[in-house]
A protein has these predicted regions:
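Intrinsically disordered, low-complexity segments enriched in small/polar residues
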Residues: 24, 38, 71-73, 96
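Short alpha-helix capping/helix-loop boundary micro-motifs
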Residues: 63-75
Length: 102
């Protein structure tokens, strides 16, 4: 199977889609990305994965595999404490001590 088909299969069957929402630093709340994460992860692990994949370390985070950027413009800041992740119908906020259900 070619890479595009495999990636699409994974996103449809093997992975869940979570939304990353920027709320911190006085931002107007908005969805910045959808991140595909393994279905077998715990919800807080899905939040961790989405957080990690929306951090710019060696490259712009929106270029990471499994990330679909949803922002307007040329770029977006990295996900930080105070931002939120929506997993299914449950919203989590990134606190200094981990993930808390909102």
């Amino acid at each position: 199977m070619n890479k595009a088909l495999t990636d699409n299969y994974d996103k449809m069957v093997v992975k869940d889609k979570v939304a990353v929402l920027h709320f911190a630093f006085g931002d107007t709340p908005h969805t910045v990305a959808f991140v595909h994460v393994d279905k077998g992860l715990l919800e807080t692990e899905k939040c961790d994965k989405a957080f990690m994949l929306t951090k710019s370390i060696d490259n712009a985070w929106w270029k990471n595999d499994d990330v679909t950027p949803m922002f307007d413009g040329d770029g977006s800041r990295s996900t930080s404490v105070g931002d939120k992740v929506l997993v299914g119908n449950t919203k989590y906020v990134c606190s200094p001590y981990g993930w808390e259900i909102v």
